[in-house]
Amino acid sequence: MHNVPIEYSDEVQNALSNGLPILGLESNVLSHGLPYPRNLEMFNACDEIIRSNGVVPALTFIRDKRICIGASPKDVELLTDDPKPIKVSARDIALCIAQGKVGATTASASIAICELAGIRIFSTAGLGGVHRDFSETLDVSADLHEISSRKTIVVSAGVKKFLDIPKTSEVLESLGVPVVGFGTSEFPAFYCRKSGAFLESFSQDPIEIATAAATHIETVGPGGFLILVAPSKEIALDDELVEKAVQRSLINASSQGVRGKAITKFVMRAIDSETDNRSQTANFDVMVEVVNAAAQIARSLKPEFFLDSVAKK
């Protein structure tokens, strides 16, 4: 992987060279997340709030047989135009590069790319986790493996409500991933505040969390550090309403023979319907809140932490 060409935008390259805070972002949410033009509105809102914190945004994606870090307006247009870029997880990076396709990176791909490219901290709205039917399908997201094996700080709103959040928390513990709540003592469920899985470690102080994360990355652990941010009460969806929608949709999915990756879209459509599409608004708002929290943590990291990543590339 270290022989793969990496193309940095001038802004990201300058930030790397000078130890400025940088925040990695996935491109899949731009290409395959919200419908147009809400996807662009969300991207621009996130870009603005990251910059307002004095942090450089670094969108990750693949084009022209290169891993790209930092997007120009032309790149953003490429990632949102039809035909859509292919969705790239960590396992797909090499093939996407070899085939010369345009790739929109998921969380797992972005975490891998961030470590490779010297980007120390990455933010995403929702991670994958352990599925509720794990005993039958053995379905566990690659996101968990990537967090455990990459020296990258990850900031997220947890995992979606239809996953098995207590089991996801247990897997992260088994993998040795530190999980810390930023302003929350409960493992958040994306656009829901409650999950029933409580966190052993949490803090209100971004500097304290940044210090702990940097210490883990530099000296303690072989892998990453996960920081969880719960949605504010103003934007969060009702936990019971979403849980009922999830349970009904999973029963319907089983009776209709919906399996594997198709379950995610099936359940998300059910939640959209049950909430009168308020879930799409919540998706937008959660992403903005998470990148704001991530940017606060990024700017709390010392310049030496970012400069050291350049030396290790």
UniProtKB/Swiss-Prot annotation:
Its cofactor is Mn(2+). Homotrimer. One of its GO terms (biological process) is nucleobase catabolic process. Substrate binds at K87, A107, S141, A142, D143. It catalyses: D-ribose 5-phosphate + uracil = psi-UMP + H2O. Keywords: Glycosidase, Hydrolase, Lyase, Manganese, Metal-binding, Plasmid. This is Pseudouridine-5'-phosphate glycosidase. It is an enzyme of class 4 (lyase). InterPro entries: Indigdn_synthA-like (IPR022830), PsuG (IPR007342). The active site is at E26 (proton donor), K160 (nucleophile). GO terms for cellular component: cytoplasm. Catalyzes the reversible cleavage of pseudouridine 5'-phosphate (PsiMP) to ribose 5-phosphate and uracil. Functions biologically in the cleavage direction, as part of a pseudouridine degradation pathway. Its EC number is 4.2.1.70. One of its GO terms (molecular function) is hydrolase activity, acting on glycosyl bonds. Belongs to the pseudouridine-5'-phosphate glycosidase family. Binds 1 Mn(2+) ion per subunit.
